[in-house]
């Protein structure tokens, strides 16, 4: 946050981070695995009594926000929440991959997966998550690599061109 030298921006980022930490604590699904994981619901139901789906790209975008904030501010709470959220993705692993090799857009409260994913948006989010993961932990996350490779193969097979090829490039070693 400090890199921008804009105090109002920094305060807004910190305010959103505090909101999101609280939101995630109240609106998540537990995903069991070697390390417990959370999938944070995309939206809260107005009545507060109905859980909504978790889209993979939203989960990744929030992980990316938290890891970026951790790298800037050094608050271990941000890294810890990003880690438990990433565990939610990793614990499901190949279940995110649809039969056609694309990724499922979302996981629903009943545990099912579905909806058509964006052509390249989630791919870029995955690459950015991998870049940030490497910056924090010094290595790649293997399940992220698996999802990146599957999405890239689907993109290649379907003629999808990524208009933002530079995203995550510094760290992702794609093997298609």
Residue ranges and their predicted role:
Residues 1, 12-17, 60-65, 82-85, ...:
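Small-side-chain structural scaffolding
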Residues 1-2, 53-70, 114-134:
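Well-ordered alpha-helical segments within folded domains of soluble proteins
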Residues 5-9, 58-61, 74, 78, ...:
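Structural signature of alpha-solenoid helical repeat junctions
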Residues 7-34, 77-102, 135-165:
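Long, well-ordered core segments of solenoidal/helical folds
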Residues 70-120, 124, 130-131:
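Surface-exposed substrate-engagement region within the catalytic domains
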Residues 168-176:
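Conserved small/polar residues in nucleotide/adenosyl-binding loops
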């Amino acid at each position: 946050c400090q890199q921008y030298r804009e105090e109002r921006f920094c305060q807004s980022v910190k305010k959103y981070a505090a909101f999101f930490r609280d939101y995630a604590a109240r609106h998540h699904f537990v995903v069991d695995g070697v390390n417990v994981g959370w999938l944070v619901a995309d939206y809260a139901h107005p009545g507060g009594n109905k859980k909504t789906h978790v889209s993979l790209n939203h989960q990744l975008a929030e992980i990316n926000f938290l890891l970026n904030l951790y790298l800037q501010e050094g608050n271990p709470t941000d890294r810890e929440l990003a880690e438990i959220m990433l565990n939610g993705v990793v614990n499901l692993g190949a279940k995110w991959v649809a039969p056609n090799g694309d990724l499922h857009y979302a996981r629903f409260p009943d545990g099912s997966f579905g909806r058509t994913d964006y052509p390249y948006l989630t791919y870029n989010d995955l690459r950015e998550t991998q870049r940030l993961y490497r910056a924090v932990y010094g290595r790649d996350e293997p399940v992220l690599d698996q999802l990146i490779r599957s999405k890239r193969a689907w993109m290649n097979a379907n003629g999808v061109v990524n208009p933002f090829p530079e995203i995550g490039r510094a760290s992702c070693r794609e093997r298609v």
